[in-house]
Amino acid sequence: MAKPVREVARLVLLDANNAALLMRYDDGLADRISYWVTPGGALERGESHRAAALRELMEETGLAAEIGAELWERHFDLELPQGAVHQHERFFLARVDTVAPRVFNSSPEPIREHRWWSLSALKATRDVIYPEDFTSALATVLNGAPHGAA
């Protein structure tokens, strides 16, 4: 039987210095490590990816930003507490015109920390970041080419 598809919108949110906002998730389970991801989440019934991106940005950061170009997408299988799904994520660019604005999380998710990451800090970290190619994808975006472009 095919796994249900979980549609997700994610944001590559950049500040005025091109630092990217990532959130550290840690559910406190001993057998799982914490990891960093971009803001975003599952679409609600009838919601577009762009609308979900705006809603998730506000819920997870308290920030508002105009949603820009779609950068890339990815598909993968994921085990959630409710069961296995096939996740389809679409990533959108968004910018804020200040440097490292303060963020506020109002979502019930196990978000433990927000951090604005420079490209050099991302290249140097040993922390787990998803998607795994986020650092190289961000470098491509900052150099002006869409991720995956030849």
Show which residues each predicted segment covers.
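Charged phosphate-binding loop/patch that engages nucleotide di/tri-phosphates or the phosphate backbone
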Residues: R126-A150
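Unchanged
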Residues: L43-E66, R74-I129
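Generic short beta-strand segments
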Residues: R24, L71-F76
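Residues that flank catalytic or metal-binding motifs in active/ligand-binding sites
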Residues: E7, A16, E70, H88, ...
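A conserved beta-turn-beta hairpin within the catalytic core of GNAT-like acetyltransferases
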Residues: L29-S34
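Conserved N-terminal beta-strand and adjoining loop/helix that marks the start
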Residues: M1-L21, G41-A42
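Beta-strand scaffold of nucleotide-dependent catalytic cores
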Residues: L22-R24, N105
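A short gly/proline-enriched turn/hairpin at secondary-structure junctions
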Residues: W36-T38
